[in-house]
């Protein structure tokens, strides 16, 4: 169910509320919501480094793959940065990684939106959201997260777990056990959060999701080693 009355928010929070500072690498490949993600994390006290090549990430404690746009152009841009192998090695080494929106979808093997292969880090595919009567398409607006397994990002019974979505495609992993939360879309359940060891990915935009987005980012930052 979409909730349209909550005002749109981008996180601008007090730095003093978060005393643990990290260097976070934000992958800049020409498809990301770089500005709003940067401002959100800086307001939480984090140092953000824009990553365009491998050497720039050597001092980072975590990497973020943001994304707004289409699957194939995003994969082409990533290929042109020579970062694909580095992203795969980063995740396989156990370092913290966060994918946001299109950044989640690129982690999969393929997408209905394009013909190119994805990163293939997560087994499964990205499917077109089905047309359902009385449901908005594309899926744009606020939805309440449903916890599907115990995880470090949301807690069962928490109030106001509403987050902001803008997407036309949704993730269908082969292993449903990595889905940490979903949202209702008519009779369908759409993947909202994937958590698998050091790999975290969300279909919604935490940087545009008010207090719930703040909580999500804080808990992820707390888990960074």
PLM features: what roles do these ranges have?
Residues 25-44, 207:
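N-terminal beta1-alpha1 ligand-phosphate binding loop
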Residues 6-7:
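Cationic, low-complexity basic patches in intrinsically disordered or flexible, solvent-exposed regions
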């Amino acid at each position: 169910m979409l909730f349209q009355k909550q005002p749109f928010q981008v996180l601008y929070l007090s730095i003093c509320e978060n005393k643990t500072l990290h260097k976070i690498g934000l992958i800049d490949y020409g498809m990301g919501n770089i500005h709003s993600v940067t401002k959100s994390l800086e307001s939480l006290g984090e140092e953000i480094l824009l990553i365009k090549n491998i050497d720039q990430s050597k001092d980072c404690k975590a990497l973020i793959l943001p994304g707004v746009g289409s699957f194939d152009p995003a994969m082409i841009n990533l290929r042109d940065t020579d970062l694909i192998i580095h992203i795969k090695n980063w995740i396989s080494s156990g370092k913290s990684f966060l994918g946001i929106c299109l950044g989640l979808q690129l982690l999969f093997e393929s997408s209905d939106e394009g013909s190119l292969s994805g990163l293939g880090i997560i087994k499964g595919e990205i499917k077109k959201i089905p047309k359902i009567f009385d449901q908005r398409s594309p899926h744009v607006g606020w939805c309440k997260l449903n916890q599907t397994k115990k995880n470090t990002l949301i807690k069962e019974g928490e109030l106001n777990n509403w987050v902001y979505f803008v997407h036309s495609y949704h993730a269908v992993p082969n292993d449903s056990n990595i889905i940490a939360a979903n949202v209702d879309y008519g009779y369908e359940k759409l993947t909202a959060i994937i958590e698998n060891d050091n790999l975290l990915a969300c279909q919604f935009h935490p940087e545009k999701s008010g207090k719930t987005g703040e909580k999500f980012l804080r808990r992820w930052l707390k888990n960074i080693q």
